[in-house]
Amino acid sequence: MRPDELIPDRDDAPPVAEIAWLLERGYLDAIEGELKSGKEATVFLGRTRVGLAAVKVFRDLAVRSFKNDGRYRAGRYIGDARIEKAIARRSATGRRAQALLWAAHEYAMLWRLKAAGVSVPDPLVGPDVSDIAQAGEVVLMRFIGDETGPAPRLSDLRLAPDDARRAFDDAVRALAAMWRAGVVHADYSTYNLLWWQDSVVVIDLPQAVEADHREARELLARDVASLCTTFGHHGVDAPPEEVLRLVTSG
């Protein structure tokens, strides 16, 4: 079957060239349908030799929906002033370049956090940067869930008190492990945490920043506040100041 026959006929479908490369290299066997469509990306269900996969596609038209994306990109090396200008102008070239940068950065963060022992979806391309570049704006990672469906986000669940506390403690440990690894998620809440087999899985990392980023501490404090607020809906009462001290004390 040709690569274009595996791809849905829609504006935000995975790009044919990148999917062809993933097929030829044996990373991907098939795309079966859409899992989720958001402002920044669409996620499709794929099949690989090692099982189900999430095929996340950053769309150039959607890059504009990242609020203050320059804030997160600060300090990231691009090396081409023309590309920087195109991104700043939001031209077609700039939007495409930005989609590629978000995808490459998410791959880098997935590999880094996996090595640090943080529960994230296993990246299925890389860590070689040339392979990641070939994948373009497509992030291929292990699917969290099973044949019956994807793992739910914590924001979509109503947990029993004991489960809610266990999930919160797990999420705080993950946040602390990221900080020790030199990473701040920068969009951390129950909306970006999956609950699978009684464990938290951290997702959505394109906006993650280095711990030496000029606004890292502010972004970390915001992450902690968001985590405490969204877990408040599950009945967990945790003072953000205490949680922040716990996260940064290790």
Q: Which positions does each model-derived feature cover?
A:
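Catalytic-loop signature of eukaryotic-like protein kinases
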Residues: 187, 191-193
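Residue-level "edge-of-site" marker
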Residues: 126-127, 191, 244
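C-lobe/activation-segment region of protein kinase-like
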Residues: 160-167, 179-185, 196-250
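AlphaC helix of the protein kinase catalytic domain
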Residues: 149-160
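Intrinsically disordered, low-complexity regulatory segments that flank or precede the catalytic domain
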Residues: 1-7
